[in-house]
């Protein structure tokens, strides 16, 4: 089912990988909600995005007993926190992490596993020439662990999540393309250590083991860039028969984006001040 979901006739393309430091993660989450709401009429979309020195926190992270101390750790390393509008836990974003959102219409219903399988199929096609060893399954010791962690030889390089809004589904992945996967994990480990301070909580936060994470460049032992990976995304979709059209939001979508961004900013203001 996953590969079949990828076989859309047409994709709108939104490339937001080179917008720099002025492009804030709150804008990204508002963007995906906007595309989900219009996908039934405007068609499937693929959005790529990069954020610099950002740690995206989940709803449970916002309930950490010493959150302010954890945020101080992030600031000390030059990172800014953002609260996402869905579940999941802390994830590190920087210039070496490519994020991809696959936005599909829920015509006939898309079950949760099918959405994950579609993204897994895409990533496997992207790197089919380099490896056939990309596995899906929780990597214990990684940050934001889940059943659709992607790994090679037991080391996680990507995680997949989903967001469903108004008849559309956004399947989102972060791909650690280059840089040190273990250094990113060390940052998250330090964040949780400061935010928990040894306290027992009702929710069990991950015990991060930095050695469980790596970048694709480290795992494949060849130079990789975000730009190279983005070309692989587009090529893989075109090989499946899709036409790709660089796009911008319509007037209606722009208005909706403004509303969605306002909600994201309000959410972050309440938690982070």
From Swiss-Prot:
Disulfide bonds: none
EC numbers on record: 2.3.1.204
One Pfam family matching this protein: LplA-B_cat
Keywords, ordered alphabetically: Acyltransferase, Transferase
Reactions performed catalytically: N(6)-octanoyl-L-lysyl-[glycine-cleavage complex H protein] + L-lysyl-[lipoyl-carrier protein] = N(6)-octanoyl-L-lysyl-[lipoyl-carrier protein] + L-lysyl-[glycine-cleavage complex H protein]
Pathway field: Protein modification; protein lipoylation via endogenous pathway; protein N(6)-(lipoyl)lysine from octanoyl-[acyl-carrier-protein]
Keyword Acyltransferase among UniProt keywords: yes
Domain BPL/LPL catalytic span(s) in chain numbering: 40-245
Positions marked as site (Lowers pKa of active site Cys): 156
InterPro entries (UniProt xref): aa-tRNA-synth_II/BPL/LPL, BPL_LPL_catalytic, LipL, Octanoyltrans_LipM/LipL
Transmembrane segments: none
Active site per database record: 144 (acyl-thioester intermediate)
Molecular function per GO: lipoyl(octanoyl) transferase activity
GO BP term, example: lipoate biosynthetic process
SUPFAM superfamilies per record: Class II aaRS and biotin synthetases
Keyword Acyltransferase: yes
Note: The reaction proceeds via a thioester-linked acyl-enzyme intermediate.
General function of this protein: Catalyzes the amidotransfer (transamidation) of the octanoyl moiety from octanoyl-GcvH to the lipoyl domain of the E2 subunit of lipoate-dependent enzymes.
Family of this protein: Belongs to the octanoyltransferase LipL family.
Name listed for the protein in its UniProt record: Octanoyl-[GcvH]:protein N-octanoyltransferase
Species whose genome carries this gene: Exiguobacterium sibiricum (strain DSM 17290 / CCUG 55495 / CIP 109462 / JCM 13490 / 255-15)
Record lineage: Bacteria, Bacillati, Bacillota, Bacilli, Bacillales
Encoding gene per record: lipL
